A protein has these predicted regions:
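Short S/T/G/P-rich N-terminal loop/turn motif that feeds into the first structured element of a domain
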Residues: 1-50, 54-69, 75-92
Length: 92
């Protein structure tokens, strides 16, 4: 079952997306098995990431293999909110 992942990164700004792009994480994500979509942006106090994956396991495999190894020393991964996708509307 497809899942939605929402991650909130306090104190992070729009530079996060550029850094992820430069590190190649976004290209790796697009090629990852089970990846469906990604949207993200800065709010007044954090950077919010919303992704859709074919399964929780697909997201976890990608996150553990591509994001966790790149976290700076002393930075721990946040626990995202995840829920099963029940409706996805796209243009015809």
């Amino acid at each position: 079952m497809a899942v939605v992942m929402i991650s909130e990164l306090p104190g992070v700004d729009a530079g996060f997306a550029q850094a992820a792009r430069e590190m190649g994480i976004l290209d790796e994500m697009v090629a990852a098995p089970g990846f469906v979509s990604h949207v993200s942006g800065a709010t007044n106090s954090e950077y919010r990431v919303v992704e859709v994956w074919e399964s929780r396991e697909a997201w976890q495999d990608w996150f553990d293999g591509h994001v966790v190894p790149r976290l700076p020393p002393g930075v721990e991964a946040t626990t995202p909110e995840m829920f099963e996708l029940s409706l996805n509307i796209t243009p015809a």
